[in-house]
């Protein structure tokens, strides 16, 4: 019988609260005998969750963005270099029995969408990917890149505002 794989997704940069939650999550996954799968980078939620699982004696797998094993998180037992860039997110989701998403940015949002698309059960750890998430995904230093419109007329009005800001 194959082992249960829990995919832990989240930002490459994160605040202390998110990192502590990811580390605790990794520990709890390991204590249950589940395999922790992550994006495998040595930063943010990926490193924190791997560290928690590794310290608890769990098995950890990292599916890397690039083909450089030197970019792997400390504590990974299995490193899978892909060279697929963001395409590796599909592998992360399909290889997971259940996906847990921690606070992140655009990559995490794509993993959430892929989990839903491929029918993987999804748990959001201590965040709501609404307004805060959209703000986090926006290009730093720019005006707001998103808006919520209650009706079609308001949507067109907001489009006009964006176009005017672009000089169009």
Predicted features and spans:
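Acidic/glycine-enriched connector segments
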Residues: 20, 27, 40-113, 117-118, ...
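Short active-site oxyanion
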Residues: 33-36, 144-146
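A charged, well-structured terminal subsegment
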Residues: 98-99, 146-168
